[in-house]
Amino acid sequence: MTRYFVDTNCLLGLTFINDRWYPDAKRLFDTDNTIYTGKNAVYEYCSSTGDNSRCSADIRLDRDEGLYGEKRAKLRLKLRQFGKMLQTYSDDELDIETVMDVYVDRFDMKESEEKEVRPRLQKYFEWYFEKEGELTRRTAREAARKLKDVLMERSIKHKDQIEARVYLEPMRDREYPDVEKRLKEWPVHMKNNADIALICDAVFLKEEIGISHFVTGDFTDIYSNQDWIHENLGFSVLYLLETFAGEEKPTAGLDLDD
């Protein structure tokens, strides 16, 4: 069975069903392979606060801070704003494209994110308005409220699944100054200390339990240096959106039935 190391984006991608990485992260986590992560990914994911550091934090997957807590707070705020913004339109002005444009605007989506997320969200709204038989200010407001409830509930459920599915042990207990030095020098020139820390976590797990793949959800220095990492550190780097891409099933909106 293959042993994967996943970064923070993979964890967030599975947690939030409106995340651009959700379909691909779900396919990864639905495999029979063993999935590991490291203390630095979990620090970012759910253990960082304004008062702790990577060295001082109590790093556990059952905590609710970090990017997980921040994204949940943002969801609550942005979806409330979304619902209120829809109420500024008359019933005659509302159509599915207008609803989606307001959502994209409220969430400040980048073009790349919009391309991934908008079609899935549009399926949800189309399903909801068809179920209600009309698209009005009332049904738009109710659809926004339902979406908020679903996203919040699923984020809790999926985080529980991550706690049960992902191994944080063994946790790195030593430093890799030589690896850090080589990553910062030519030809890699890696500048992001958080990425370097993630790689060192993966090096540790390569030594301890033989992880073979590092899965990342973003085009970072890690992915752009995949050949060097494979040749020198002994594990391959996989890009989540390429390796686990697939046909999305038609859905009543963001896996409402999962």
Model-derived features: where do they sit?
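Acidic beta-strand-to-loop metal/phosphate-binding motif
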Residues: 211-218
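Active-site-proximal, substrate-binding regions of enzyme catalytic domains
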Residues: 2-207, 220-258
